Amino acid sequence: MQAVALEQALKRHYARNQRWGFIWAIWMAVLWGAWYVPGTALWFEHPYVDIPANATALRLTATAVMTWVHAIGVFVWLLLWNGTLGKIRDYGRTMVRFRRISKWYALASLCGGPMAIFGSYMAMTYAGPVFAAISSLLFPVVGTVIAALWFKERITRRAALGMSIVILGGLAVYGPGLFGQLQSTQSDAWLGYAGGIMSALGWGAEGAVAARAMDVSDPDVGIQCRFSFEVFFWGLLILPALTFFTDIPVARLLVDTLANGRALLWIFLAASTHAYCYTSWYKATSLIGVSRTGGIGNLYAMLALIFIACFTLQLPAWYFLIGLALSITGSFVMFGESAESVASLRDVTSGNQAMVEAE
């Protein structure tokens, strides 16, 4: 009787984890999709709208400035979140344990901030918000491969099939642009494609690294640590280096941004959606793993298209829709597993050995 009761309790536990993991992943998709609207609108405000299209170095520096201000906004929203939950002390304790815990969040911030978020802003600028939203669809594949090779997260045949479909969707998005079928009026459109690749690789790597960190820390606290490091990297390393070693007016861009109320409004909205999108992402990853969270999170692209179309009244090109349909289909294939399949996310023996070696 006790064995039967234990088995039933475990099934309920697995089902609850899967259900809440699914719910958090859906919220991640909704908020991520919404982020592309204010993230794109910011480029139509002073000082960014005044930057000439051919001033590549200045535009990239402006992207770095807005990414830093955005990271500060996300940090403030997360501070409010953790303050409400009473986890500020946990945040402090986690930050000071750099060797064992917070070093992983520092690495995640490098993957997610200077690489992924910066790359996504580049894609919005040089290739448009629709391309930026859909090009990141490959990030679950990147995250799943890293998680499988690093700490042996299990990949079922169904998950592998889903990833293959997502890859086809990504090829459908990139193909026309790579072969010259995307008629862009910007000579620097390749920077948009590079930004899309950066966002996919960066967010995929961040998902795997964050999953490693959440083995020994709380997701709410972890995401606060991650953005703390991003604020540090941009504000104390990258932007000061640009200020001292180039003649680009970094300080003027920052002052003009902070002095423009409408620019701050868009940053405020973008930071609020991204803060709780990231919170949902980390919570879902801790419950259902890197691959499944990324698979369901890919719904953000469909939602981004809806949000962008509502605000711009413009529909995307046909090949974007093909890539979107394939990627969304692959996402549902990846998630369509039983609750018991999610019960053991990793090959525990070899996974623990890999983590020990990483220490």
Region spans (language model):
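Hydrophobic transmembrane alpha-helices of multi-pass small-molecule transport proteins
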Residues: 2-7, 158-177, 298, 307, ...
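C-terminal transmembrane-helix exit sites in multi-pass transporters
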Residues: 55, 140-164, 302-321
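Hydrophobic alpha-helical transmembrane segments of multi-pass integral membrane proteins
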Residues: 19, 23, 27-30, 56-84, ...
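Specific transmembrane alpha-helical segments of multi-pass solute transporters/efflux pumps
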Residues: 31-34, 91-130, 172, 270-288
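Membrane-interface helix termini and inter-helical loops of multi-pass transporters
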Residues: 43-58, 175-188, 243-259, 314-316
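Glycine-/small-residue-enriched transmembrane alpha-helix faces in small-molecule transporters
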Residues: 1-68, 183-212, 350-359
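Hydrophobic/aromatic residues within transmembrane alpha-helices
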Residues: 42, 66, 123, 149-155, ...
